């Protein structure tokens, strides 16, 4: 029997970073993926993501499940590119499951990722697409 992982939905950003950074479609529209904020001097286009909220749900007979809400922001210097980025992110994340494993062998499994909201805007001289995903994490 595998050892219980210490990783919970608080580590979901690590999983999202790996998922987006390893996706060919996403890397085809940008090679810059940042947690929370972009690095100083980052050039458009780029993606930022953050964990917006977290909920733990106990289940009587099974291992519990955490739910994390992840916001992914796609920034580009033109509207069409921002939409292409959003489409690539949605294709990479929506309706998938994903397993992340760190260097120490700890793992985190997103049993389902679902897009729940999206909007667009203008922020810091860039077109922005905001996508919100609900990520259900196995606690095993």
Spell out what each predicted region is.
Residues 56-59, 77-79, 139-140:
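Short, cysteine-centered beta-strand-loop-beta hairpins and adjacent loop/turn segments enriched
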Residues 45, 68, 111-114:
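Short beta-strand or tight-loop elements
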Residues 9, 82, 122-126:
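Short capping loops/turns at secondary-structure boundaries
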Residues 34-36, 50, 73, 116, ...:
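Residues in well-ordered beta-strands of folded domains
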Residues 86-94:
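Long, well-ordered alpha-helical scaffolding segments within enzyme catalytic domains
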Residues 94-140:
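Acidic-leaning, charged glycine-interspersed low-complexity segments
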Residues 64-82, 89, 127-137:
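Oligomerization/assembly interface segments of phage tail-like spikes and tubes
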Residues 1-62, 84, 96-107:
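Small/polar-rich, solvent-exposed N-terminal microdomains that initiate assembly or binding
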